[in-house]
Amino acid sequence: LLHILGGVDTPTSGSVVIDGTDISRLDETALAIFRRRQIGLIYQFYNLIPILTVEENMTLPLLLDGKKPDKAVIKELSKTLGLSQRMTFLPNQLSGGQQQRVSIGRALINNPALMLADEPTGNLDSRNSHEIIALLRRFNREHGQTVIIITHDESIALSADRTIAIVDGKIVKDGVNG
């Protein structure tokens, strides 16, 4: 499901409409551009490039899109993520929570319409897990981004506005959380 929503896999039927664009009809080049500009991906295992600094990892989507990073945006985002003092560090010099924040920064740098998070707290302790979820909720509120989180952690699922439970490929629960 996450791969279909992220434009990595193609649906066998139907369509996938994100921010008014049917991504299932885009060619590979257009899809790559759309994904880079409109979809933020956060992975359980961070997928940071080990030889790039925190700032370089965060701004990579902009550089791939031929855009010059806005220093004021980077400064504000790094402050929000608690990374201001770590921008020149390499990933191996960071804690797991800090690495996940870099991953979130990279996903947010283009202010995407859709954020897809695959087990974003799976490798973190409970304190860092709650901080990461709070950050995602904050960006949802402040920037109107849709955030879809794939998780096996019931406490994280219950903190969402809406929960859809899928078992063996079928929706077994779809409801608003109170």
Q: Predicted regions span which residues?
A:
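ABC family nucleotide-binding domain
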Residues: 1-166
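H-loop (His-switch) and adjacent beta-strand-loop-beta switch element
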Residues: 163-176
